[in-house]
Amino acid sequence: MARLKPNQDLTESVEALCRQHGMKTAIVRGAIGSLIDAHLQYATPNGPREMEINGPGVEILNVFGEIGFSDGQGNPHPLQGVVADTDGKIFAGRFVRGANLSFITIEITLQEWVAVKQQEAVPA
């Protein structure tokens, strides 16, 4: 469990937390809080598009995804989620890196994913 302070980017902060605690792979189990504005990406037949949900005070309803670093490279998995604007209208998509700043705070729950070798697995 971690708390992001005001003006910290959601994606970049979660990645930094994982690095700080030596997590090579982690799963976001949930988050609550608010964003100044939300910037989400979504798929269309003509390719990805972005939308901006204006705040301040865009509420986070759910965040999910996997954080993983392979061979020292960046995280190829964007976080996804659901947010509500100040009128209660709901939006979903991938959070755009560097564009989703915490308004007051965001509390987020991460679980480290530790790979188990086949011979170490416990039979069912």
Predicted regions and their residues:
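N-terminal intrinsically disordered, cationic/polar leader segments
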Residues: M1-G30, I36-A124
